[in-house]
């Protein structure tokens, strides 16, 4: 029905699609500016409870803003700098939106707020509110009205803090997005021209990609009133929109060319292309959307943003490929064909490769499997961790320079203290609930933990080896509030850089004489990380189940989907391997200019897994559809494999090349995890389209033979009722294709009925 509609009214469909595209561009521009600056925070976690208690009981919180004051001529103890530091602290304290502030120049401030050489010192502040308020409103105003006012020839003032770091990261991601647009679009057009050898199909394919990218951003605008969408979703919409638009358009145009080569006129060829290849595109889109939809499992807006973006991209790519593109095919006619005419698939490279593989499946398949295992071996050393300023590459970013100074010159990082809160606990002299001695012993115990520089509490300030508890640096009133008390556990810079998550666990594991909750910036990052890692098994299970169902509906087999899932997981191990080897261990640091931290941020790796797995299944759908089509036509379980691969592998290779190039553009990003995403995804797509589809798939299908298309009786009946049925490419006239032999007909009927 859709094909007939497009054939009858191609101009109407094309004009409507063009107007939708132009409207999408206009709406997309407003979407990008409205996206959110999400934090790495886990709602409902212990750190969230601590943050709420600090706000409610103490009117303070973990410092999320820091100002580094550097003296140009003397030290921070010089009279002029002391006076300026006091004025700066007062200005920050009084600034609209700031809830609390203190500094090295505050009364009884600890020495850790100054550098070892006394040339730098810190002002810390807590700004309540969500990330958009803090990063979008308070910080820009603080930079313009306070930092720039106090910055002078005598002292240099730099703005930092956790929210400032990721404000800069988000801004850099936006700049990378714009640069990627300028590079990806002409690059894709050139590659498409090399694939098609004609400008018309290249422009049509790029138009579908732009339709998917712009349309997805426009759809996200409809979601924004109901949920937060991360700024990084725009990057995903661009690269996946272009990639899926190219994938689906290549598949449709290749099928159109085959239909014309089989003797059908161009009008009939369009209808048969939509009726046949269009359904495969739909199933492929369902697979990719399902792989990304599992991100809704996570209660983190940063991750659910990519689920919304992925679903929107798939919807727009499928619509563009099955509605707008057929209208172009109908109007362009023979201008969409190869200038030299179609070649025989049997003469192609992939036919020869797959035939060679199937002659010796154990040898070739074993060699391919060994290569995957070797490339994926570094995955065994994967270590999850939390991001910090080092996600910004070395360069001209002041916030990165600021924290390099803090790491090298400061013994501890007060802004990253762990905050231990005991709500509804009266502590102190004369208390009947918790004696002051219990608080004294608990604070002293925390100070003995490896990597703890100092513990501040109402009972005093404790350092390792000092259990006497001298007077607290800010006075007892900062650590007591009515029926509550709190402690500040200050980590050393070395421990914070090496193992912040381990420190959080040790603090939480220390026996306390009263109920406590542990918060602070390191605890928030640890809870976010744990929230992701704990749900990884569920996400993996959901992805496997959903993709199995989609492939079963397409093939009617239980063996082929299982084989595909195993091979896809093996290909993804290569992606994980290069991330660990290149980014966690730093092998690519010199080439790309980032700073390795020895850990991988889990949410980005999870996003990569979902995208790569969905795209792998995308290619698997194309491949299996053509192999099964050949099997249904000939009944030959062996020859159908190279024949199907010969017809699908060229377009899969071309699509993978273009998609890999689009992802690889992000290797030039100034944000480390965008580089990780670009390099890892480019490699995953390249390996999947070559080693997996060209070697391991034909080897596996040769070894499983006719069992590849087997399923139990009840499932066969279910597939007969609801499964995908794609007609083969048949000549327009002449005798029907050779019927399968009698001994294979029952099996074929089960798979093609």
Model-identified regions with their sequence ranges:
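Short hinge/gating elements
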Residues: 34-38, 387-389
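Structured non-transmembrane domains adjacent to transmembrane bundles in polytopic membrane proteins
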Residues: 44-64, 72-163, 384-590, 599, ...
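Disorder-to-helix initiation segments
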Residues: 36-40, 47, 239
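Membrane-embedded transmembrane helical bundles of large multi-pass transporters/channels
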Residues: 1-34, 98, 129-384, 513, ...
């Amino acid at each position: 029905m859709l094909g007939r509609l497009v054939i009858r009214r191609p101009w109407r469909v094309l004009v409507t699609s063009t107007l939708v595209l132009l409207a999408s561009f206009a709406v997309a521009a407003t979407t990008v500016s409205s996206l959110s600056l999400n934090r790495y925070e886990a709602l409902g976690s212990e750190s969230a409870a601590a943050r709420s208690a600090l706000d409610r009981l103490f009117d303070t919180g973990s410092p999320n803003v820091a100002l580094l004051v550097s003296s140009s001529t003397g030290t921070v103890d010089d009279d002029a700098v002391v006076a300026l530091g006091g004025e700066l602290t007062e200005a920050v304290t009084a600034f609209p939106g700031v809830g609390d502030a203190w500094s090295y120049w505050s009364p009884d401030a600890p020495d850790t707020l100054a550098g070892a050489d006394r040339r730098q010192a810190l002002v810390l502040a807590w700004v309540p509110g969500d990330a958009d308020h803090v990063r979008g409103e308070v910080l820009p105003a603080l930079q313009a009205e306070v930092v720039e006012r106090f910055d002078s020839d005598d002292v240099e003032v730099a703005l930092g803090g956790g929210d400032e770091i990721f404000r800069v990261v988000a801004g850099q991601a936006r700049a990378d997005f714009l640069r990627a647009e300028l590079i990806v679009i002409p690059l894709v057009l050139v590659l498409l021209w090399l694939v098609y050898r004609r400008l018309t199909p290249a422009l049509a394919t790029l138009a579908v990609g732009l339709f998917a990218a712009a349309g997805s951003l426009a759809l996200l605008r409809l979601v924004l009133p109901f949920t937060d969408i991360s700024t990084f979703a725009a990057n995903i919409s661009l690269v996946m929109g272009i990639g899926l638009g190219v994938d689906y358009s290549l598949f449709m145009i290749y099928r159109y060319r085959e239909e014309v080569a089989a003797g059908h006129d161009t009008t009939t060829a369009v209808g048969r292309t939509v009726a046949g290849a269009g359904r495969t595109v739909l199933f492929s889109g369902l697979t990719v959307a399902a792989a990304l939809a599992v991100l809704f499992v996570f209660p983190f807006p940063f991750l659910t943003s990519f689920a919304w973006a992925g679903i929107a991209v798939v919807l727009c790519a499928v619509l563009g490929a099955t509605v707008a593109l057929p209208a172009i095919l109908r109007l362009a006619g023979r201008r969409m064909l190869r200038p030299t005419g179609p070649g025989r698939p049997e003469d192609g490279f992939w036919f020869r490769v797959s035939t060679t593989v199937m002659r010796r499946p154990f040898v070739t398949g074993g060699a391919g499997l060994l290569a995957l295992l070797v490339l994926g071996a570094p995955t065994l050393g994967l270590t999850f961790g939390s991001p910090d300023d080092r996600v910004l590459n070395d360069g001209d970013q002041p916030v990165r320079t600021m924290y390099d100074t803090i790491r090298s010159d400061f013994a501890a990082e007060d802004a990253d203290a762990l905050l231990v809160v005991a709500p509804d606990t009266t502590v102190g002299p004369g208390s009947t609930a918790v004696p002051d001695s219990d608080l004294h012993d608990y604070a002293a115990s925390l100070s003995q933990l490896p990597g703890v520089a100092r513990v501040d509490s109402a009972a005093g300030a404790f350092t390792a080896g000092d259990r006497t508890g001298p007077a607290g640096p800010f006075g007892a009133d900062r650590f007591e509030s009515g029926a509550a008390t709190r402690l500040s556990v200050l980590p050393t810079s070395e421990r914070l850089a090496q193992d912040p998550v381990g420190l959080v666990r040790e603090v939480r594991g220390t026996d306390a004489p009263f109920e406590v909750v542990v918060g602070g910036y390191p605890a928030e990052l640890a809870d976010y990380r744990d929230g992701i890692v704990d749900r990884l098994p569920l996400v993996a299970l959901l992805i496997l189940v959903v993709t199995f169902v989609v492939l079963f509906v397409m093939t009617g087999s239980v063996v082929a989907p299982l084989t595909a899932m195993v091979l896809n997981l093996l290909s993804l191990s290569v992606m994980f391997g290069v991330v660990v080897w290149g980014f966690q261990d730093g092998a690519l640091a010199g080439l790309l200019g980032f700073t390795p931290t020895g850990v991988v941020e889990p949410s980005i790796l999870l996003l990569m897994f979902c995208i790569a797995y969905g795209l792998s299944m995308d290619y698997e759908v194309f491949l299996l559809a053509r192999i099964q089509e050949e099997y249904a036509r000939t009944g030959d379980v062996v020859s159908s494999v190279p024949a199907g691969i010969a017809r699908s592998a060229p377009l899969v290779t071309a699509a993978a090349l273009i998609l890999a190039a689009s992802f690889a553009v992000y290797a030039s990003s100034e944000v480390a995890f965008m580089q990780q995403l670009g390099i890892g995804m480019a490699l995953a797509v390249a390996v999947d389209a070559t080693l997996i589809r060209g070697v391991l798939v034909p080897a596996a299908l040769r070894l499983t033979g006719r069992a590849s298309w087997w399923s139990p009786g009840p499932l066969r009946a279910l597939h007969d009722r609801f499964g995908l049925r794609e007609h083969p490419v048949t000549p327009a006239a002449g005798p029907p294709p050779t019927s399968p032999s009698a001994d294979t007909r029952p099996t074929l009927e089960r798979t093609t009925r």
